Amino acid sequence: MLTGQHHIPGIESPLMVVLWRVAAGVFLPLVPTMAVFGNVLVILSVYRERNLQTVTNMLIVSLAVSDLFVAIGVMSFGVYYEWNGFKWGLGSFFCHVYQALDVACSTASILNLLAISLDRYIAIGHPISYAQYGARGGRAMISITIVWGVSCAVALPLLLGVNPMENDQCELANPWFNMISSIFSFFIPCIAMIILYTIIFRRLRQRERARSLRQAQRSETDKISSALLGGAQIARQMGKHFKNRTDQILLEISFQTSSFPTISESSDDGSTISPMINSFNNFLPKKSQYPSTLIPAIPECGSMPNLTIIERPAPPEKEKDIELSIMDLHDTVEMLDDKYTSAMITRSFGEELEEILPFIDGSTSVKNSREQLHATRSNTSTTRLLDVKPELRSISVPSIQDEKKMNSRPPENPFAHQNGTNKQRLLPNPGILMKSKSTTLLKTNGYLDTDSLNNNRNSHKKSTADLLPNDDYSFTDSMRVYKNRLFKSLSRATSGWNKPRPSRHMVKKATKQMRREHKATVTLAVVLAVFLFCWLPFFILHLSNSICLVIDSNSDCIGFLPLYLATWLGYLNSSLNPLIYTVFDQRFRNAFRNILSCGFFKKR
């Protein structure tokens, strides 16, 4: 039963007593009501919303339970004690229960905040370990069990009568118990939490700096990679164009000792070649004057897959003119060689690509082609004509890439590749066709013996071996060498980029999770700051008063009113935590709104 006494310790003025009573009658019941309402919302939100059922939120539920016990079991007795004029009329048992609940719930709140701080430290400082072991409900239950076990152990001496009640005053009057409990249940956990949150925010700051640095490096890396990959793409495209163009040009210069260059219908620069070749058309015999013999197609393993050769013997009176035409043709081919190798190839692909030209078409290169041209011209100028009739050939060579047809009907050079020591005998064996590994076909309508044929082949192999490496490379192989060299340089420039990159979904999920962890850390830091603001004055005054009483038990160190106000400031913290969650956490805010609206917003 409330006594209604107007005497308040520390207040002597009647006016102040009246104001105190009015404020206490309005304010004191409001604090526990808000605490019960808010913490029940927190518990229901985590219970109802699956996305809130995390380890951190389970610890928050434990904190809400301790605040709920403070509101129900501690604040209610505090309101009664104040309304009864600070006289305890419920007996010593309830006084001990009241004091034990006060100490246990306050200690549980502090230890729950410490457990949350440890959870935040592991989540921010060691995210991989947290993802593997920390984000489990079992660990949260172990932490909660330890928190409440320690809290009950700290409050157990009060139930055993360590703090006896005197003169109807239910207060914590044992100074030694007050000092020990304050140090171990508040100050040590507070120091640990401050250290942990300092490390956490330092890690967050370092992570933000590293993220900014990665973004800056990523922009530069993207520019470099775009340039390199773009260059590789351009090189591949130019390589295709170069292959098509080289197939046509090398077809012209490959017949330097056996026939005129062909007039390619698929040439990209026909206007350049045609005027040079047309000057020799006057020496060609008419198509209808001589019979032709069709030789079956010859499969070729290189840049020319098949050839169709048509023989047309030339009249004897044209032999001299054909020889002179061939001599002039070497100058034309040499000019074409200079034009398309040094000008176009070097300009398009750089000097590095010239190293690959020895592998193009199996047996020709820029330098060696020129040497062969000069050597052939010298040989043709000093060698007399044999009594072998020249012939005309019509060669149809499908292109490898675009399968365009290239046809020509120029007269053939009557001189095949010869070794200086070869001796020729005239035997009636016409139509012998020799095929080399390159695109040059050696064809004579004369007479060769077996030794001459073998020597010719051996000399060709020997000359080819000087031009080629150990293996025969087609144009595709040479371009593959260039591509491998290019991508090796790219791999050196982009070392470290070949690590497997996570999918966009995983990156997005990880980014979202990190933002959520950051927001949760900020929210809990605010909770810790508010907790320290509410409870630190009480424990400082409480510890100071206990030390003072230990030194001098008869002195009145700190008055009743400051301790009473500091106690209710600590109780106020239990009703502020749900407000903090509502302001700083969108998920809790949505959950509160769904509960208060009976799920109306969630259904919509």
From Swiss-Prot:
Residues 45-58, 118-141, 201-520, 581-604 are cytoplasmic. One of its GO terms (cellular component) is synapse. Keywords: Cell membrane, Disulfide bond, G-protein coupled receptor, Membrane, Receptor, Transducer, Transmembrane, Transmembrane helix. Residues 399-430 are annotated as: Disordered. It comes from the Eukaryota. SMART domains: 7TM_GPCR_Srsx. GO terms for molecular function: dopamine neurotransmitter receptor activity, coupled via Gi/Go; G protein-coupled receptor activity. Disulfide bonds join 95-170. The keyword Membrane applies. The keyword Transit peptide does not apply. Residues 1-23, 80-96, 163-179, 542-559 are extracellular. It is found in: Cell membrane. The chain crosses the membrane at residues 24-44, 59-79, 97-117, 142-162, 180-200, 521-541, 560-580. Its main location: membrane. PANTHER family: ADRENERGIC RECEPTOR-RELATED G-PROTEIN COUPLED RECEPTOR, DOPAMINE D2-LIKE RECEPTOR. Belongs to the G-protein coupled receptor 1 family. Receptor for dopamine. The activity of this receptor is mediated by G proteins which activate adenylyl cyclase. In terms of antagonist responses, would be classed with the D2-like dopamine receptor group. Mediates the effect of dopamine on the inhibition of locomotion. Acts as an antagonist of dop-1. This is Dopamine receptor 3. It comes from Caenorhabditis briggsae.
